[in-house]
């Protein structure tokens, strides 16, 4: 899809959710994980098609920053601990979340900025 043309086929992005979603009829799934089959989709209503615009939806967090991640982990520690007990195969320990965040957060912020710029450019055509 043109809005996603520079995204790698596989990449690591931050997840913090315990629920999934069904895609709208006619949507194209653009991302999935082993734990959650629907992680993102693109979609066009008839009005979007007329305008040449798209709905782009993600169930992951490109917007997490090096500053916000420790706050999220601290404030969400009870949820993390519960998740570690209930879903140990998909929930990571706080130290692992912070280490992986430090590794991936900047490239994901750049990916988000690129997607936003493409969305804005497509809306201005």
Please identify what each model-predicted range represents.
Residues 1-67:
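Pocket-forming structural segment of enzyme catalytic cores
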Residues 63-125:
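Acyltransferase
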